[in-house]
């Protein structure tokens, strides 16, 4: 990947983070922390890798994306808006009565959403079904799902992992957001799921652990997924919750609340400065 390509993606990621802040500020609630830390991987999937078309969001041979950690919907909505599925201005309607941008993704209301999610563990199960369906139909469809490291405390995730390996779902890419924080504290103190890499390998997954904010590593891992033809892939994304906004970074306090007016102003000032720096670097 060239530096110019990485700069373009970084700008998309910055816009995604701005959208997260806009939405959660307008709603006065939501989950900004775990939304901010997946901006890089979402920008790569939606602007480089996935076979999708905003003009035809339901085309049968499209790749599928399932946000299993459905509470991070602000990041998905901001990504879809950035990609052209709906107007960016609509992000300010997050969680409003009558809005098609509810607190958790709704496939029946929101253009570009492939699966309704929210109940932790169910999204990865649905992704397995999509991947198996594509295999049975012999369609060249890849299925991506992002789940949280707190989410893997749910037993349903491990049932899904067992299912994926049994059916050799090589078209399934599980992306595990490893930020080490969940609503009640660190994952290590609430319910330690480590060592995740070894456990997933024991479930017969192709497992890669990368820096979830590094585009070169993201691209290499996704290419390794495409090269795998016998087993499902799990990419463990080492991330920092709240990345991009100083006072939200690595803070459990920002798992589930929206910024007030003062906090919004600070966050947007920081993100605008970050975008301006990228623009300057691009000259």
What are these regions, as identified by a protein language model?
Residues 77-79, 106, 156-158, 184-188, ...:
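Short acidic, glycine/serine/threonine-rich loops at helix termini
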Residues 215-283:
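Glycine/aspartate-rich loop-and-adjacent alpha/beta segment that forms the canonical ThDP
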Residues 112, 116-119, 124-227:
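Thiamine diphosphate
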């Amino acid at each position: 990947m060239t530096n110019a390509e990485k700069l373009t993606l970084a700008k998309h990621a910055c816009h995604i983070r701005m959208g997260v802040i806009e939405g959660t500020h307008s709603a006065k609630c939501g989950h900004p922390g775990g939304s901010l830390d997946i901006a890089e991987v979402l920008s790569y999937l939606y602007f480089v890798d996935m076979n999708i078309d905003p003009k035809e969001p339901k085309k049968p041979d499209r790749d599928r994306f399932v946000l299993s950690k459905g509470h991070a919907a602000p990041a998905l909505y901001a990504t879809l808006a950035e990609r052209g599925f709906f107007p960016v201005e609509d992000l300010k309607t997050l969680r409003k009565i009558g809005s098609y941008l509810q607190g958790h993704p709704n496939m029946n209301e929101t253009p570009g959403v492939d699966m309704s999610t929210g109940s932790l563990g169910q999204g990865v199960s649905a992704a397995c079904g999509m991947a198996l369906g594509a295999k049975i139909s012999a369609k060249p469809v890849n299925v991506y799902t992002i789940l949280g490291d707190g989410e893997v405390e749910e037993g349903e995730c491990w049932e899904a992992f067992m299912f994926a390996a049994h059916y050799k779902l090589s078209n399934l890419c599980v992306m595990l957001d490893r930020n080490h924080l969940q609503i009640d504290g660190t994952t290590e103190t609430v319910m330690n799921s480590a060592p995740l890499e070894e456990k997933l390998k024991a479930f017969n997954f192709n497992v890669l652990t990368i820096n979830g904010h590094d585009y070169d590593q993201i691209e290499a891992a996704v290419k390794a997924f495409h090269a795998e033809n016998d087993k499902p892939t799990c990419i463990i994304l080492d991330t920092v919750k709240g990345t991009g906004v100083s006072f939200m970074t690595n803070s459990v306090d920002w798992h589930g609340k929206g910024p007030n007016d003062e906090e919004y102003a600070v966050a947007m000032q920081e993100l605008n400065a970050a975008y301006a720096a990228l623009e300057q670097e691009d000259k």
